[in-house]
Amino acid sequence: MILARLVLLCLLVQAPVVEALERGPEGSIVEQTTVEKIYRGVVFAEVDDIPLSLDVYLPKKKGSRPHLVVFFHGGSWRSGSKESCQVRWLVRHGYAVASVGYRKSHAAKFPVILHDCKGAIRFLRARADALGFQAERVAVAGASAGGHLALLLATTGGVEELEGSVGGHLEYSSRVQLGLGMYSPTDLHHDAITAPDRWDKPASSLFQLLGGKPSEKVALVRKASVTSHITSDDPPVLFLVGGADQPQRIEHGKRLKAAYDKAGLQAVLQIIPGAGHGGPEFRDEQRAALILEMLDKELAGRP
């Protein structure tokens, strides 16, 4: 009982305390806590009169403007929320974090969902000064389906047919400089041709993402596969997956690593012993150190 109370006390001491609320840009609410400045509900685009929004978390410590990490939540492309931001802990290490809300597969199929994500990157670059971060070099991260979108952003920079125009700001680039995927699908084409009995069902997440049977949408499922787009100008990527997750998710990481190796690019694959589909192991001391090392190198230019 005493130990439990001590743990609870530590959590309470570390938790951010809300100090003030005010109005911010693009319809947002600005929330000031003891450790963060938060812009909630920043509208980055409107599609058919429906606003798409994101949240921005900034470290409160004074100094140079922080570098930006953009997060995309999971949920099989059909559920989930930007409130589920699994890399918010990076704010305590001096990084700005944006968590993006994108349309789900009941309202938007591929590649429109990716267009939302690219639109968010362009918007964040366009509004970097107003929101208070650096966006010349940007990292993206995501969990599960969100990791798939993050890794697509990393590997489709400059692919015009996948750019879209959501939110405008087409004078800004959607290219990113580092990709982090956590237990994410990377080779949807492989899944579609090896397990059609599973993925051709209307209830499957891949069927709903593509708007039909994957086995009958071969060209589209190739475009939706991260491994289809890897070229020599792609940025480094980090892929984390649990050793106790489904074998196919581990294979996705291995196929991504193999494709990157073949292209002569940097891909770090870590299979975390005993971890499942998510959990605290993905932000433990060892993983946090690795993520920070790659961010410091690729965004801040620190060796």
What is the role of each PLM region?
Residues 105, 272-279:
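Histidine-bearing beta->alpha loop at or near hydrolase active sites
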Residues 79-82, 98-135, 281-286:
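Catalytic nucleophile-loop/oxyanion-hole region of alpha/beta-hydrolase
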Residues 246-255:
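Conserved alpha/beta-hydrolase "acid-adjacent" motif
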Residues 122-194:
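Primarily recognizes the serine-hydrolase "nucleophile elbow" in alpha/beta-hydrolase
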Residues 233, 239-241:
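Short beta-strand/loop motif that positions the catalytic acidic residue
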Residues 62-66, 72-109, 160-162, 189, ...:
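Short substrate-entry loop that stabilizes the transition state in hydrolases
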Residues 31, 159-162, 190-229, 235:
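Mobile cap/lid helix-loop segments that gate and shape the active-site cleft of serine hydrolases
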